[in-house]
């Protein structure tokens, strides 16, 4: 599924919807470089998908950005965010 980088106005009001297991470098390959983290994250991807779904991928309460295999949080306004992120990840990383 096609996506663009979203800004904070689009991701405002998102919250935890699910998780995905991945390496940091895999997320960078699929979704590009992340934004700097906020109060309780070190990095975050903010994404707007072509179907209107908005999603975030982030670590939570980590002291350093996880580089190994990690259970990343997926935020959104509905469970569709999890589907959009995981299906795009699988499609792109298997290509």
What are these regions (language model features)?
Residues 1-95:
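Residues within mature, well-folded domains
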């Amino acid at each position: 599924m096609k996506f663009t980088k979203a800004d904070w106005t689009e991701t405002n009001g998102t919250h935890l919807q699910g998780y995905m297991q991945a390496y940091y470098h895999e997320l960078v390959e699929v979704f590009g470089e992340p934004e700097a983290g906020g109060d309780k994250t070190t990095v975050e991807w903010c994404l707007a998908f072509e179907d209107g779904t908005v999603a975030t991928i982030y670590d939570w309460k980590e002291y350093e950005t996880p580089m190994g295999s990690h259970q990343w949080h997926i935020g959104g306004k509905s469970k569709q965010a999890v589907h959009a992120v995981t299906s795009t990840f699988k499609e792109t990383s298997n290509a």
